[in-house]
Amino acid sequence: DFHFEAGRTYKIRIEFVNDRRGARVIFGYSAGWENFSAAVEAARKADVAILCMGDNEETSGENFDRTDLNLPGRQLELVQAVYATGTPVVLVLQSGRPVTANWENDHLPAILEAWFPGEQGGTAIAKTLFGNAAPGGRLPITFPRSVGQIPCHYSRRPGGGKRYVEMDWLPLYPFGYGLTYTTFAYSDMTLSRSVIGPQDTVTVSVTVTNTGKYTGDAVPQLYVRDMFSSVVKPERQLAAFRRLTLAPGESRRVELTIGPKQLRTLGPDYV
């Protein structure tokens, strides 16, 4: 790393040997970390601090390998410095990968995963944070606590052990996880039948009630597990889901139907 002073001109010579196909030179610079104190002071005077952290095209994308899944660089240091002011912190993650946000999860009151949201992402994030829209998405991947848990996809096959020496074996955020500005209760679940044939379907019905103070989207999810398969099957598989918007106090009956397509298995003879 080289330090460049403002107002001075520097001559830079780069020597590069291309010893493999597809090699390239990337020249860039960092604005430095002198604004840490300015950010901390601004947060100290604010009612709420919104920190947008995460990746860009240089740190996350196709054909990128990583040795850790933490926030890049010194981003966590900035988050911790702002948190130390006592001002409530909302963390907006913009990333194309899971983040091992253990400290952030334990200390911050709100985390919004925005992924790489595109040119109108700022508008969508602002509407969500200011209450004009309620978050309703559910994670399509699993967020591990550490790279040592990888692979930790939700549909993993049964293994011998579920314990680590230094941490919980459960992921930080499981597949299908997600919060919104309200709460929901599920009750009166019933099955249309208890036994089905090879070509039959079964419908699971459940009542979903918005028990909070705000309108929000509930996402009932139905998972299946084969307890007596002739081949090793995942511990659970997503078979069906619905997304519905409920006003405060509103209840609705939801039906999720599954059949041979969701329950079939490729046998040991590939039939």
Label each region the model flagged.
Residues 213-230, 236-238:
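Short acidic, flexible loop segments centered on an aromatic residue
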